[in-house]
Structures are given as C-alpha cells and as structure tokens.
C-alpha cells in the first residue's frame, strides 16, 4: 500500500535507481509505521554538497554542507497565525514539506560510520520525515525521543548498519 505521494527529484543525476527505490520504500514503510494518513504528500530532493550548502546558507545562515535539511509546511513561523483546516471542507491532501539530502555527504558519512550508502540514505530520509512530523533534537529529551523513534522505524524495516 502506498501511503505517501513522493515527488522525487535527483539533481545529481548520479543516484542509482535501487538507492532511490530503497529510500522511497523506507519512507512508505515509515509512513505506515507512524500511521500517517493515506495520500499525504512530500517532496524529496537529492542534491550535491554545494547544492545543500547554498540552501543551508540561504535558509539557516550556515555556510556549510550538511547531510539533510527538512522544511516542514505545518511548522509555525514567528508571527504566523495558525489556521484550523478542520473547519474547511477541503479535498486537498496533507502536504508535509520538503526533504533535501546531500548524496555526497551521505557517502562521506557512510564511510565514516562503516556502513553502506544505502543505509545512510535510508537513515537520512527517516530523519528528515520525522522533522517534517514535528520531531526535533535541539534538547536532550527531544533528541532521546526522536532518535529512539528513528531507530525503532529503521530496525522494524530491517535496515542494517
């Protein structure tokens, strides 16, 4: 069963089809595992270190490459008013937001951690999804919850280190 509608873009043009399929499969599994409603949408972009560095600089004021960045559409910004969508009879699907992964950083980290690139891509995809769902790891208690759930999902899927 397909829970998520994933708009996937490979800006690198270097990612293997099986890596893309693995990431999509893990995200679908995670969506079912986390009981995300059917038809929920997200975008997933694979980019280079330079591509993610530009995004990181523009949106986070950090002039460096990172492994994954998530932009949650349901997250409230400063001064924004929350809209109760429940009062509208809309047939539009829920859009979680965007996950951007640097494939170069994923390769670097896979080597550093001694596991496969596929495992690292799966880890980063689930990490990004959890951010879209509102999880964070800025505080120790938040980190424990998020990383615990991340491990639980990856273990349930069977993605080995």
From Swiss-Prot:
Binds 1 zinc ion. It comes from the Bacteria. It is an enzyme of class 3 (hydrolase). Its EC number is 3.1.-.-. GO terms for molecular function: metalloendopeptidase activity; RNA endonuclease activity; zinc ion binding. It is found in: Cytoplasm. GO terms for cellular component: cytoplasm. Its main location: cytoplasm. It holds the Pfam family YbeY. Keywords: Cytoplasm, Endonuclease, Hydrolase, Metal-binding, Nuclease, Ribosome biogenesis, rRNA processing, Zinc. Signal peptide: none annotated. Zn(2+) binds at residues 127, 131, 137. One of its GO terms (biological process) is rRNA processing. Its cofactor is Zn(2+). InterPro entries: MetalPrtase_cat_dom_sf_prd (IPR023091), YbeY (IPR002036), YbeY_CS (IPR020549). HAMAP family: Endoribonucl_YbeY. Single strand-specific metallo-endoribonuclease involved in late-stage 70S ribosome quality control and in maturation of the 3' terminus of the 16S rRNA. Belongs to the endoribonuclease YbeY family. This is Endoribonuclease YbeY. It comes from Listeria monocytogenes serotype 4b (strain CLIP80459).
